[in-house]
């Protein structure tokens, strides 16, 4: 009965129609004990599927609130019980395991201490959970791994944005969509939804806010922004807040590590930490899992939502910014505390040592009690103690441990393990540096395609991972592809494909054609099949060469192929000062002011290599150019011509743009490649299958007798059959 009434009860908690919605997803029933998140989430999805948007919002929000409340209970109970003297672990167990001293009173003593402390800690945690969650609440509200993963991926917000949209709450719909997208930047449907929200009149730029941003990231970004404006005094409170928030976030993560053993991931079971044998093996196995999880909290705290990798040296770098900012405003004592804390991580850091000497000289007489920060000292001592135990288990029990910290002293690692760890690191060279291309003299002799020559390498292009190759297309092949682009543009009114003004400049017209669209037009008889087939063949030709040159030991996959033409608009070229395509990088958002490139949306972060295969040169302007990360200093310039390929890595090392096309029409095949097979271009596969089907049908028709029907099927009907066969109407994907 209670489960049937839950949607109605939660519906009453929603604000009345027309009332202002509070910013963010605030608590629906403050002070109330959390309910079972899994039941709330399941009920919310049922309401969503039934189109009951208001109950769906209430249930999904309450599921989020309850999940967060459970996390706070674990954190609070863990902290209070850890502070209980009667439940403290024996001091002898907090450091490295000592060699067995043999049977006797000493061994029995620590065993009794351990078990007594474990029992008291368990009793304390049970009583605390009962007070906060009710009797048996910890077991009743336990969440399975599948649901934890769904909440970590922020899936409730995917449903919330749709429900809010149906309720006409566009501000919250955009916020929920943005919150989901931040953690799932590769979600193509949400990328399209975000673009739609941006075009809606009722949505403001402020609507796109992350409702789940960890507080330490918000403070960190604000502090960096203020430092960039030379406002150290205003930045200091935000930087300190970021550091304290980072430490608090790690404590929350560590509390989650102490859940039931079944909640630990399968990763630990594979590395030998799973429970085997008797009592002590079981205790050791679970304890190792907890320690491994705690050590991973450093990387999780340093990883932005939606990012794959943590910010390197996150805590030490925060301390570096703090001591520099304190010094700028004259807080020398605090500057010394923070620089001494940096030296706890890196005792031989020359820059930190120079800064310390400078601060001490400016301060004058040494002040008693001035040392590293106590919170950082506690963090390092605890982390080193855990590492010591994990390396011991690695050496003696055969478990594995991936140390997340570059500052771990080498002396802490057992000598027997150092060589093995060094070998493991050397087995994966691409994790540390890109594959180096072969020298120019090698490529002049062994290029894969006859007639292809390497014209310029990275050295001649004044950069890294760049190359210009000529001869990939014959003049006849360039003509076929140019005709394909022209025919597709001419068929725009019938197919939904039409040119438009360039999104980068009002002085040019932009036309784009994907491989799938070309295949569909060829199947419909709108364009010739020769051009569509050549488009597929040439894209694979470019992929093969790019992989052979830049990544011979790691397969590359096409992620997107686009035939693009830019045409100068007559009468709009006088005194033109803009570019055809502004300077950018292909897999990160370039910040010319700082020279940094953020690998995050809206950039296509999975792109690893880019290629531009030119089809003509009978136009004015339109040269490709590379720059420094400041987007101002030009380092190389490439003039398009038929069959010329410019290939380069897609990151910050290769910012590039296109000079204005001031006369004529410039056409090129743009291709992007990825190491990630899950991001390979599915439309390329569909296009290939579609063209193969067309060829088979043509061959069958040739074998049959000529039909007496004087009225063959019109192209529009044939086009409709293509749509039906693929299961959906063909769509044009625009990508610049």
UniProtKB/Swiss-Prot annotation:
Residues 253-275, 689-736 are annotated as: Disordered. Residues 1-20 form the signal peptide. Detected in fetal cartilage (at protein level). Weak expression in heart, lung, ovary and skeletal muscle. Glycans are attached at residues 331, 462. Its cofactor is Fe cation; L-ascorbate. InterPro entries: Leprecan_dom (IPR056585), Oxoglu/Fe-dep_dioxygenase_dom (IPR005123), P3H (IPR039575), Pro_4_hyd_alph (IPR006620), Pro_4_hyd_alph_FE2OG_OXY (IPR044862), TPR-like_helical_dom_sf (IPR011990). A motif (Prevents secretion from ER) lies at residues 733-736. It comes from Homo sapiens. It catalyses: L-prolyl-[collagen] + 2-oxoglutarate + O2 = trans-3-hydroxy-L-prolyl-[collagen] + succinate + CO2. This is Prolyl 3-hydroxylase 3. The gene is P3H3. TPR repeats lie at residues 37-70, 154-187, 216-249, 316-349. Fe cation binds at residues 584, 586, 656. Part of a complex composed of PLOD1, P3H3 and P3H4 that catalyzes hydroxylation of lysine residues in collagen alpha chains and is required for normal assembly and cross-linkling of collagen fibrils. Required for normal hydroxylation of lysine residues in type I collagen chains in skin, bone, tendon, aorta and cornea. Required for normal skin stability via its role in hydroxylation of lysine residues in collagen alpha chains and in collagen fibril assembly. It is found in: Endoplasmic reticulum. Belongs to the leprecan family. Pfam families: 2OG-FeII_Oxy_3, TPR_leprecan. Residues 681-709 form a coiled coil. GO terms for molecular function: iron ion binding; L-ascorbic acid binding; procollagen-proline 3-dioxygenase activity. Residues 561-675 form the Fe2OG dioxygenase domain. Its EC number is 1.14.11.7. One of its GO terms (cellular component) is endoplasmic reticulum. Gene3D superfamilies: q2cbj1_9rhob like domain (2.60.120.620), Tetratricopeptide repeat domain (1.25.40.10). One of its GO terms (biological process) is collagen biosynthetic process. Identified in a complex with PLOD1 and P3H4.
């Amino acid at each position: 009965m209670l489960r049937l009434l839950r949607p109605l009860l939660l519906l009453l908690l929603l604000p009345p129609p027309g009332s202002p919605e509070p910013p963010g997803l605030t608590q629906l029933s403050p002070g109330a004990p959390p309910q079972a998140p899994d039941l709330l989430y399941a009920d919310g999805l049922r309401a969503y599927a039934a189109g009951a948007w208001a109950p769906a919002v209430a249930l999904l929000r309450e599921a989020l609130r309850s999940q967060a409340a459970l996390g706070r209970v674990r954190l609070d109970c863990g902290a209070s019980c850890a502070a209980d003297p009667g439940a403290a672990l024996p001091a002898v167990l907090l450091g490295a395991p000592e060699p067995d001293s043999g049977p006797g009173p000493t061994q029995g003593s620590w065993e009794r201490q351990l078990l007594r402390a474990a029992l008291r800690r368990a009793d304390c945690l049970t009583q605390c959970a009962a007070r906060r969650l009710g009797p048996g609440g910890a077991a009743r509200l336990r969440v399975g791994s599948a649901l934890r993963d769904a909440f970590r991926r922020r899936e409730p917000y995917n449903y919330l944005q749709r429900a809010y949209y149906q309720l006409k709450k566009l501000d919250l719909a955009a916020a929920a969509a943005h919150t989901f997208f931040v953690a799932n930047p590769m979600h193509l449907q949400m990328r399209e939804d975000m673009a739609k929200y941006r075009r809606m009149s009722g949505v403001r730029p402020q609507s796109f806010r992350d409702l789940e941003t960890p507080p330490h990231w918000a403070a960190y970004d604000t502090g960096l922004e203020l430092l960039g404006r030379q406002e150290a005094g205003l930045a200091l409170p935000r930087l300190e807040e970021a550091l304290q928030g980072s430490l608090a976030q790690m404590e929350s993560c560590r509390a989650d590590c102490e859940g039931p053993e079944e909640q630990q991931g399968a990763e630990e079971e594979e590395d030998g930490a799973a429970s085997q044998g008797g009592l002590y093996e079981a205790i050791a196995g679970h304890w190792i899992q907890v320690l491994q999880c705690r050590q991973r909290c450093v990387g999780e705290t340093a990883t932005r939502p939606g990012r794959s990798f943590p910010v390197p040296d996150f805590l030490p770098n925060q301390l570096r910014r703090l001591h520099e900012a304190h010094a700028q405003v004259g807080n020398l004592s605090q500057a010394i505390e923070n620089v001494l804390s940096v030296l706890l991580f890196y005792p031989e850091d020359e820059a930190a040592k120079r800064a310390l000497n400078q601060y001490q000289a400016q301060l004058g007489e040494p002040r008693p009690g001035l040392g590293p920060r106590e919170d950082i000292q506690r963090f390092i001592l605890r982390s080193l103690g855990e590492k010591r135990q994990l390396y011991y288990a690695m050496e003696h029990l055969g478990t594995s441990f991936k140390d997340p910290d570059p500052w771990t002293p080498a002396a802490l690692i057992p000598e027997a393990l150092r060589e093995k760890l060094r070998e493991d690191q050397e087995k994966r060279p691409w994790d540390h540096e890109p594959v180096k291309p072969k020298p120019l003299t090698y490529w002049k002799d062994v290029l894969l395609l006859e007639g292809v020559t390497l014209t310029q390498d990275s050295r001649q292009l004044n950069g890294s991972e760049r190359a210009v190759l000529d001869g990939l297309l014959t003049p006849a092949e360039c003509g076929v592809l140019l005709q394909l682009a022209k025919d597709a543009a001419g068929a725009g009114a019938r197919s939904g494909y039409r040119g438009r003004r360039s999104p980068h400049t009002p002085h040019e017209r932009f036309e784009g054609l994907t491989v799938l669209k070309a295949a569909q037009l060829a199947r419909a008889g709108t364009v010739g099949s020769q051009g569509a087939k050549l488009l597929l063949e040439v894209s694979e030709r470019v992929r093969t060469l790019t992989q052979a040159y830049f990544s011979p030991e790691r397969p590359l996959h096409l992620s997107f192929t686009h035939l693009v033409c830019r045409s100068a608009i007559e009468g709009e070229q006088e005194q033109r000062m803009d570019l055809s395509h502004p300077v950018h990088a292909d897999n990160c958002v370039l910040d010319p002011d700082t020279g940094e490139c953020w690998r995050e949306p809206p950039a296509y972060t999975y792109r690893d290599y880019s290629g531009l295969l030119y089809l003509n040169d009978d136009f004015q302007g339109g040269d490709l150019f590379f720059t420094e990360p400041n987007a101002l200093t030009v380092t190389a310039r490439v003039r398009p011509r038929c069959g010329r390929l410019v290939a380069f890595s897609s990151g910050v090392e290769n910012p590039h743009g296109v000079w204005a096309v001031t006369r004529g029409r410039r056409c090129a095949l743009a291709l992007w490649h990825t190491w990630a097979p899950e991001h390979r271009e599915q439309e390329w596969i569909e296009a290939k299958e579609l063209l193969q089907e067309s060829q088979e049908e043509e061959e069958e028709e040739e074998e049959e007798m000529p039909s007496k029907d004087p009225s063959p099927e019109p192209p529009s009907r044939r086009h409709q059959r293509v749509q039906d066969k693929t299961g959906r109407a063909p769509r044009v994907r625009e990508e610049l």
